[in-house]
């Protein structure tokens, strides 16, 4: 992971360490948003990974979607599937 991506990952790691145990398991997606964010930063770097993580977090709300949503590029079968 690049140094900038490591800096972007700090708030995610802090959330997982400090807030997640108190908030509980409320993520609508699998993998969870924090796992998704760390994986996106690892695979795609700070800019694209940060953008993917921000989009995912903005989609995670009661009126948003749910279900299996891996990081693009992580699952070739997922990348070929049409979105709709």
Swiss-Prot record:
UniProt keyword annotation of Membrane present: yes
Domain of life: Bacteria
Keyword Cell membrane: yes
Cited InterPro entries: Membr_insert_effic_factor_YidD
Membrane association type: Peripheral membrane protein
Matching SMART domains: Haemolytic
Localization (cell): Cell inner membrane
Cellular-component GO terms for this entry: plasma membrane
Ranges of Basic and acidic residues composition bias in the record: 75-84
Pfam families, sorted: YidD (PF01809)
Function: Could be involved in insertion of integral membrane proteins into the membrane.
PANTHER family given in the database record: MEMBRANE PROTEIN INSERTION EFFICIENCY FACTOR-RELATED
NCBIfam families per record: membrane protein insertion efficiency factor YidD
Protein name as catalogued: Putative membrane protein insertion efficiency factor
Organism in which the protein naturally occurs: Cereibacter sphaeroides (strain ATCC 17025 / ATH 2.4.3) (Rhodobacter sphaeroides)
Lineage: Bacteria, Pseudomonadati, Pseudomonadota, Alphaproteobacteria, Rhodobacterales
């Amino acid at each position: 992971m690049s140094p900038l991506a490591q800096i972007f990952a700090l708030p995610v790691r802090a959330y997982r360490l400090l807030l997640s145990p108190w908030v509980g398991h409320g993520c609508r997606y699998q993998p969870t948003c924090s796992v998704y964010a760390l994986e996106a930063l690892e695979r795609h770097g700070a800019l694209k990974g940060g953008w993917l993580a921000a989009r995912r977090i903005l989609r995670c709300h009661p009126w948003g979607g749910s279900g299996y949503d891996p990081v693009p590029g992580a699952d070739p079968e997922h990348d070929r599937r049409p979105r709709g």
